[in-house]
């Protein structure tokens, strides 16, 4: 450094340094921080802890291990909390409308606290579904050195000597409703499915997005697949405390990590693992935060060239803890690297490339969770994008857990998830029908609820292989069966799904990438001319605010975006 060079400073110096900051230091001393603490880099610890449900229950304890690591590496941690909604608990209720909305609130609130306190670095601790993309989006906006650590998966439960997850409980509801399961068995399953803390145990949304975190490079490779309630997870948390200090010293920022290449790597991981369709929504939003050009067709292109390698629930035999035992997420990365399906030079938070990290993977001899490239489950991945007169902006179908590539039948229309669930229970839905659930999109719901209650109830009946379901809402990562979600434009903005009637013939043709209702253009236009937007379900509060600002699902259902107004909520009017 020359004599004329400015003195190096930390972002947090604007809060803690100089005589005029004495009032701020006085308040920080009252909170227990010493003058020595305030001279060190200040690292925000964004926690999504709640005691409502198992997914985030252990994060308060895990945060202590992170803070220990930060202190050991010469930093001062400052922990704060944000919100979290348990998808598994709210599923099938009005409360589920809060889930996707919470992604934006999580990102907004972390951004506010970090900007307000001028942290030098940030670790975001996530668990349940929306906390993962929400924390990543906050890191992108802030663009300060930081990383996301996932709290880890729950251990599998046991029922009649079989491994079970929460998916089995949801499906048991349909089995029980049809008289094929006793009250006693349902209660026993309920008591044993979730043995402790950790996120839902299959390749559902949380584990899909935690894998994406590692493939994006914003989580250390191998950290997220470590199960929740293990000493190893505590050790990982402590190492992350060390790592964030190294990121601060080297000034490695999310904008250097989350690039187009990194996002394409993450999409490949979803395809190879049979991951949740929610990844489409979240990765579009993550791309948006970094101004990376990405559209839903990119998911189809990448999935089409990526083999399905992981036999994970909901369609396979294995749970997330089995994946860890087999070699974890690094093993999946190693397979895709060997197939030349990754951008090998993408940077990660360790300072190494994803190729350098993947080469360190250790495969457990005899494991069956991650297939060799010579013996994939399928030659192509689990996601496809369909378009047609029923979804001009596109929709998403997951090709895992069923073999049907073509379905045609009369529509059975429901105006909400509750109506559709009642249709399963009272046997209104008949074999051969296409179940249409509308006004559940980002604006119409609002909040784009997941339809797991409906799909799981169907899966627990004899209808499982004989109906298809389409919706402008979403599906849980635990969904299996022929289900098409994210239909856009959505019904609330006059998308074609709004004017489908009972008995209309709908064709779902996966190979042709088509979703079509058998109406001429003139017939469809005539119906749309007579369509009137329904009254908003909420006229004040967070849901009303969200509905007025959210974009179409085809753009990631983002809010406060720079996307042109014509794309907001998929409006065609």
UniProtKB/Swiss-Prot annotation:
GO MF term (any one): 2 iron, 2 sulfur cluster binding
Modified residues (N6-carboxylysine): 130
Domain of life: Bacteria
Record Pfam families: ILV_EDD_C, ILVD_EDD_N
PROSITE patterns per record: ILVD_EDD_1 (PS00886), ILVD_EDD_2 (PS00887)
Reported cofactor(s): [2Fe-2S] cluster; Mg(2+)
EC number, as in UniProt: 4.2.1.9
Job of this protein: Functions in the biosynthesis of branched-chain amino acids. Catalyzes the dehydration of (2R,3R)-2,3-dihydroxy-3-methylpentanoate (2,3-dihydroxy-3-methylvalerate) into 2-oxo-3-methylpentanoate (2-oxo-3-methylvalerate) and of (2R)-2,3-dihydroxy-3-methylbutanoate (2,3-dihydroxyisovalerate) into 2-oxo-3-methylbutanoate (2-oxoisovalerate), the penultimate precursor to L-isoleucine and L-valine, respectively.
Name the UniProt record assigns to this protein: Dihydroxy-acid dehydratase
UniProt organism field: Koribacter versatilis (strain Ellin345)
């Amino acid at each position: 450094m020359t004599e004329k060079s400015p003195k190096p400073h930390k972002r947090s110096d604007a809060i803690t340094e100089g005589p005029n900051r004495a009032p701020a230091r006085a308040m920080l001393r009252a909170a227990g921080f010493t003058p020595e603490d305030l001279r060190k880099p200040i690292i925000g610890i964004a926690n999504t802890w709640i005691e409502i449900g198992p997914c985030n229950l252990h994060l308060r304890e895990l945060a202590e291990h992170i803070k220990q690591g930060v202190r050991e590496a010469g930093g001062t941690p400052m922990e704060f909390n944000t919100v979290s909604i348990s998808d598994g608990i709210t599923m099938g209720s009005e409360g589920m409308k809060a889930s996707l909305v919470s992604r934006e609130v999580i990102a907004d609130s972390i951004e506010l606290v970090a900007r307000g306190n001028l942290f030098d670095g940030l670790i975001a601790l996530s668990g349940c579904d929306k906390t993962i993309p929400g924390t990543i989006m906050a890191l992108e906006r802030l663009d300060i050195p930081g990383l996301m650590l996932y709290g880890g998966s729950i251990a599998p439960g046991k029922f009649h000597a079989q491994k079970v997850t929460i998916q089995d409980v949801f499906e048991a509801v349909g089995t029980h409703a049809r008289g094929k399961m006793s009250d006693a068995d349902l209660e026993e399953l309920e008591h044993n499915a979730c043995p402790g803390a950790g996120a839902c145990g299959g390749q559902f949304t949380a584990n899909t997005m935690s894998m994406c975190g590692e493939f994006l490079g914003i989580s250390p490779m191998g950290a997220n697949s470590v199960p929740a309630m293990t000493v190893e997870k505590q050790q990982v948390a402590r190492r992350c405390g060390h790592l964030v200090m190294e990121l601060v010293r080297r000034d490695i920022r999310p904008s250097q990590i989350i690039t187009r290449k990194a996002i394409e790597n993450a999409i490949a991981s979803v395809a190879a693992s049979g991951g949740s369709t929610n990844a489409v929504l979240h990765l579009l939003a993550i791309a948006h935060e970094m101004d990376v050009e990405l559209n839903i067709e990119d998911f189809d292109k990448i999935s089409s060239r990526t083999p399905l390698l992981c036999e994970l629930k909901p369609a396979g035999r294995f749970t997330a803890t089995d994946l860890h035992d087999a070699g974890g997420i690094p093993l999946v990365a190693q397979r895709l690297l060997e197939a030349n399906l990754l951008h090998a030079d993408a940077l990660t938070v360790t300072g190494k490339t994803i190729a350098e990290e993947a080469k360190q993977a250790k495969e457990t001899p005899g494991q069956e969770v991650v297939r060799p490239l010579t013996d994939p489950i399928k030659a192509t991945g689990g996601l496809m994008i369909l378009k047609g007169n029923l979804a001009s902006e596109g929709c998403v179908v997951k090709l895992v857990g069923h073999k049907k590539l073509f379905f045609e039948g009369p529509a059975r229309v429901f105006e909400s998830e509750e109506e559709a669930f009642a249709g399963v229970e009272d046997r209104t839905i008949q074999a051969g029908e296409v179940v249409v659930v509308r006004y559940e999109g980002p604006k119409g719901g609002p909040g784009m609820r997941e339809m797991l209650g409906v799909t799981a109830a169907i899966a627990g009946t004899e209808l499982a292989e004989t109906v298809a379901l389409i919706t402008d809402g979403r599906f849980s990562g635990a969904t299996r069966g022929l289900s098409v979600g994210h239909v856009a434009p959505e019904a609330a903005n006059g998308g074609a799904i709004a004017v489908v009637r009972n008995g209309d013939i709908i064709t779902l043709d996966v190979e042709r990438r088509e979703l079509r209702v058998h109406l001429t253009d003139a017939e469809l236009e005539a119906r749309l001319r007579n369509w009137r937007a329904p009254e908003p379900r909420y006229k004040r509060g967070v849901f009303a605010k969200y509905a007025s600002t959210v974009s179409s699902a085809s753009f990631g259902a983002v809010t406060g975006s720079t996307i042109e107004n014509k794309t907001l909520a998929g409006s065609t009017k």
